[in-house]
């Protein structure tokens, strides 16, 4: 018996909706504080955290984590507790 491939419509409806957690620039958190939070909470390594902090500073925002909205919500709450401005889009 041969399995028939799913149609494109069926495949797209069964996918998990991927969301992104964005770090938004602000004027009150220090660069080091942002890097420390990203390494501790988002499991970024030092270089990745520094790059995200720089991109956020110069571009206004940076995508820091990708995943399902239910997985991103606790990360968002933890970062917000440390004073970072984050948003799930």
Language model features with spans:
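Terminal domain-initiation and capping elements
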Residues: 1-89
């Amino acid at each position: 018996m041969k399995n028939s491939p799913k149609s494109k419509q069926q495949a797209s409806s069964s996918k998990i909706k991927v969301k992104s957690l964005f770090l938004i620039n602000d004027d009150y958190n220090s660069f080091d504080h942002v890097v420390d939070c990203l390494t501790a909470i988002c499991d970024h390594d030092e270089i990745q955290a520094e790059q995200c902090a720089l991109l956020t500073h110069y571009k206004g925002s940076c995508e820091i984590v990708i995943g399902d909205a239910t997985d991103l919500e606790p990360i968002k709450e933890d970062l917000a507790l440390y004073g970072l401005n984050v948003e799930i889009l």
